[in-house]
From Swiss-Prot:
Pfam families: AF2212-like. Transmembrane segments: none annotated. Possibly the antitoxin component of a type II toxin-antitoxin (TA) system. Belongs to the UPF0165 family. This is Putative antitoxin APE_0279a.1. It comes from the Archaea. Keywords: Toxin-antitoxin system.
Length: 66
C-alpha cells in the first residue's frame, strides 16, 4: 500500500500529522520532498539578491536535492 502523509520533523523525529495505520515495529520507506512553494521563494530571493543566471540557481538547487 502506498500513501502520502504530511509529517513534522521535531527533535530528530518525524511525527505524522494524521493517523497512520501501522503496527508497532513496522518499517516503511520515506521519500522527503521539498515544499514547492518554499523552493520557488528561495529561487526568487536568489534571483533578486545574487544576480545569478536562473540556470545556475536551478542547477545548484537540483544538486542540493539529489
Amino acid at each position: 500500500m502506498s500513501k502520502v502523509i504530511r509529517v513534522r520533523y521535531e527533535k530528530g523525529v518525524l511525527k505524522p500529522l494524521e493517523p497512520v495505520n501501522l503496527e508497532d515495529g513496522e518499517e516503511v520507506d520515506i521519500i522527503i520532498r521539498e515544499n514547492l512553494a518554499e523552493l520557488a521563494r528561495r529561487i526568487r530571493r536568489r534571483l533578486s539578491q545574487e544576480r545569478e543566471e536562473p540556470s545556475e540557481i536551478l542547477s545548484r538547487e537540483r544538486s542540493r536535492l539529489a
